[in-house]
């Protein structure tokens, strides 16, 4: 797993959750209360299924066009960033219970995957994405 794949904001915890955190003697005390949702084998199996999500040539071209548009700026999307965008779009399609990626999947993850890589605000990244037409 790549912890730098996306920039996500979880927001602030509720007041009661923050109070509970303040009352703990150790900032790790609550970790022992967490329950896992998937085991290691299930995660690896899902990663394999995500790898099998098909991306048509037209969607690959859309990815390349998006990358080209970012590269008109000072810090364009790297090839590694482009691969991350592809993988995130595949994962999003998988979560939507589809075996193929649509341009909407790419758009759904674009800002979270790309904005922090190219040094633009979320609004600027959305504007950049809207300049690229889907063929």
Feature map (PLM): residue ranges:
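C-terminal engagement/docking regions of AAA+ P-loop ATPases
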Residues: 72-135
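A short, mixed-charge helix-start or loop-turn motif at secondary-structure junctions
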Residues: 49, 70-72
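Conserved AAA+ ATPase core "coupling" helix
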Residues: 1-53, 57-65
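Short alpha-helical scaffolding segments that buttress acidic/His motifs in well-ordered protein cores
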Residues: 22, 63, 67, 106-114
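Residue-level marker of positions within ordered structural domains that often coincide
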Residues: 9, 68, 94
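Surface-exposed beta-strand edges and their flanking turn/coil or helix-capping segments
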Residues: 23, 68, 121-123
């Amino acid at each position: 797993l790549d912890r730098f794949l996306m920039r996500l904001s979880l927001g602030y915890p509720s007041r009661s959750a923050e109070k509970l955190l303040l009352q703990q003697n150790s900032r790790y005390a609550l970790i022992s209360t967490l329950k896992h949702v998937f085991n290691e084998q299930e995660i690896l199996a899902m990663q394999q299924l995500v790898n099998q999500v098909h991306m048509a040539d037209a969607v690959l071209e859309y990815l390349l066009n998006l990358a080209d548009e970012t590269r008109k700026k000072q810090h364009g999307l790297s090839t590694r960033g482009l691969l991350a965008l592809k993988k995130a779009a595949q994962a999003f399609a998988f979560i939507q219970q589809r075996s193929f990626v649509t341009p909407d999947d790419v758009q759904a993850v674009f800002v979270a995957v790309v904005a922090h890589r190219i040094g633009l605000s979320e609004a600027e990244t959305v504007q950049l994405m809207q300049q690229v037409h889907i063929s």
